[in-house]
Amino acid sequence: MSGDLDRQYKLVVVGGGGVGKSALTIQFIQSHFVQDYDPTIEDSYRKQCVIDDKVAHLDILDTAGQEEFSAMRDEYMRTGEGFLLVFSVTDRSSFDEIPRFHTQILRVKDIEEFPMILVGNKSDLENERTVSTAEAQELGRKLKVSYLESSAKQRINVDAAFHDLVRAIRNANKASVEPLRKKEKSRRCIVL
């Protein structure tokens, strides 16, 4: 149990190009907003924080959104323990790409559900919004993931996105351990 108190989590930030994945990650790690868009190939960050009174060492992979780097996706999808599915509320096509990322993660993991959080970034640009909160919430329900809106620029729900993902990983781990414990307790030896 003590290993669970001080644990490393491999988080992966995925989504289309220009949705603010790097801005979200850098705001979380360094409390700094990156104004200029510089396409990422792949960057890795580390941060230690306390989430629900437990120390968490976060190993965050900020991925390329551009299609030309899609060959790298299977590898980081294999190793990630949880995923932030990021789209921009001002970019309809980035929202439409999310089910493809979700499906690809589940295919690579060969599982029906996995810890993921749907993040609608750039919520500060309300006048440029092309994706409503209601339709994003509906997609979250359909994909069986929770949804939140964030603004890397105004630091709205930045910490919440990463912390909620760690909680989702912890809950998934707890759910997979519970049935094993119940099986162990129910074993009985019958002598005939």
Curated annotation (Swiss-Prot):
GO terms for biological process: signal transduction. It catalyses: GTP + H2O = GDP + phosphate + H(+). Ras proteins bind GDP/GTP and possess intrinsic GTPase activity. PANTHER family: RAS, DI-RAS, AND RHEB FAMILY MEMBERS OF SMALL GTPASE SUPERFAMILY. The gene is RAS2. GO terms for cellular component: plasma membrane. InterPro entries: P-loop_NTPase, Small_GTP-bd, Small_GTPase, Small_GTPase_Ras-type. The modification Cysteine methyl ester is found at C189. GO terms for molecular function: G protein activity; GTP binding. Keywords: Cell membrane, GTP-binding, Hydrolase, Lipoprotein, Membrane, Methylation, Nucleotide-binding, Prenylation. It is a lipid-anchor. Belongs to the small GTPase superfamily. Ras family. It is found in: Cell membrane. It is an enzyme of class 3 (hydrolase). This is Ras-like protein RAS2.
